[in-house]
Amino acid sequence: DMTIHDFDMARYITGSEVVEVFAKGAVRVDAAIGAAGDIDTAVIVLIHQSGAITTIGNSRKAAYGYDQRVEAFGSLGMAASDNTHQFNSTLATDTGYRRPPLENFFLERYNRSYLDQWAAFVDMVTNDGPSPASGAHGRAPLVIATAALKSMRENRPVRITEVDAAIEGNVES
């Protein structure tokens, strides 16, 4: 549940579908999560149709606040999106660097994105325009998540084709 949006972002950023997944997970933070049959720490490698490789590191806890960053590396350079801090300031002294804490709640971190999505939705409904997302866009991360869970349980890479047909229903684009 904590990585589904990362799967969606990987497809969007690379512009390529995922063809294979390898996932490892552990309980490293909260034993109660393990007792409930879940994990709190995961590392996932996605292989894309284009040959691009995505690595995702995920944990339910970062001691310094909610940490969500993305970096894309390629032959022409790198693009990155860093964490959002409560204030955009840094103090540098002879003892090192200090910054305000990271934004903690998702509404604070993604306020601008939610407003943009609502505006696009209202525009689509008002002007009877096409949806920028299809059922297939929603289904793809679910298929990747299913492959990741199978990979983690079986300790092996899993091809998307192994789980795609097993997911009930066929969502058309």
State each model region's role.
Residues 1-53, 59-64, 136:
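Rossmann-like dinucleotide-binding domain that binds NAD(P)(H)
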Residues 6-7, 115-119, 145:
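A general structural signal for well-ordered alpha-helical segments in protein cores
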Residues 17, 50-52, 75-78, 129, ...:
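Short acidic/polar mixed-charge low-complexity motifs
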Residues 49, 123-173:
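C-terminal helix-rich "cap/oligomerization" subdomain common to oxidoreductases
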Residues 55-58, 81-83:
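Beta-strand scaffold of nucleotide-dependent catalytic cores
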Residues 63, 106-118:
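Active-site loop of classical SDR/Rossmann-like NAD(P)-dependent oxidoreductases
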Residues 64-66, 73, 82-83, 116:
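C-terminal substrate-binding/catalytic lobe of Rossmann-fold NAD(P)-dependent oxidoreductases
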